[in-house]
């Protein structure tokens, strides 16, 4: 695990950030937390469409699990009322447990899938659950030859995507 974390830190240090892509929330089924599975064209040469969609669908599944109301959620609510919410000083809620599972999954995906392709997935919790942010990195040694071709295309996409993520 230490070498995998080292690789993510190495990616941030040795590569320059080219652009960011934002995957927006999908409100087609109401306000439940889910993200669009539409493949962004900026990632076309970086990651296979199937891997991207599988990752987003897995995240959507985790968020559905977190928001699912079951017996344990009902019991948590009853205990919270009975203890004036002091119970949450001693235990994690079901939602918090699933959010930790999501963070571990994102870390694992970054190490195994995204970082080797020069990409970095940001936990949606860090962006207020509004977007999934994917940072696209370029090698500093190869950025001189490819920066002129990618700067015109990525400049317009990062300007549009940056506005959506900054709101």
UniProtKB/Swiss-Prot annotation:
Superkingdom of the source species: Eukaryota
Compositional bias (Low complexity): 142-157
Keywords: Cell membrane, Golgi apparatus, Lipoprotein, Membrane, Palmitate
Bias (Gly residues) ranges: 158-167
Topology of the protein relative to the lipid bilayer: Lipid-anchor
S-palmitoyl cysteine lipid sites: 78, 81
Keyword Cell membrane among UniProt keywords: yes
Region of interest called Disordered, as start-end residue ranges on this chain: 140-167
GO terms for cellular component: Golgi membrane; plasma membrane
Record PTM: Palmitoylated by ZDHHC5. Palmitoylation is required for the maintenance of ZDHHC5 at the plasma membrane.
Matches recorded under PANTHER family: GOLGI AUTOANTIGEN, GOLGIN SUBFAMILY A, 7 (PTHR13254), GOLGIN SUBFAMILY A MEMBER 7B (PTHR13254:SF2)
Function description: Play a role in cell adhesion by regulating the plasma membrane localization of the palmitoyltransferase ZDHHC5. May be involved in protein transport from Golgi to cell surface.
UniProt family annotation: Belongs to the ERF4 family.
UniProt-recorded name of the protein: Golgin subfamily A member 7B
Encoding gene (name): GOLGA7B
